[in-house]
């Protein structure tokens, strides 16, 4: 997005710096935590891993957004839900189980939280929860038996 004022330009630059720093920390943590050994990572073919990385970047950008006004916060939560639905649809179409998809998401969310300031955690968790609900919604739509078994 384009900044309309010097203040917005500074804020955008600061946001980009925070996102870049978090992305570097996440990459280091992923290497340290040996993501390659995670069962959910092994269950996804190479093209799916590329898509997971792209989703991760979009998710990181969304989770690290400073929201300001309440209306903007609601827009962000709607966007988080839609992103979760999109991710869930793609992973289920690739044959990745709901359990593996959730484990991958929780692993990534933990990396984001470990890489950010605790003062932003409640905002990040709120958005991440909307992603999880969207993800579950998409799996449920593809396989209604998921909910009928639970009831």
What are these regions (language model features)?
Residues 96-114:
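Elongated alpha-helical scaffolds
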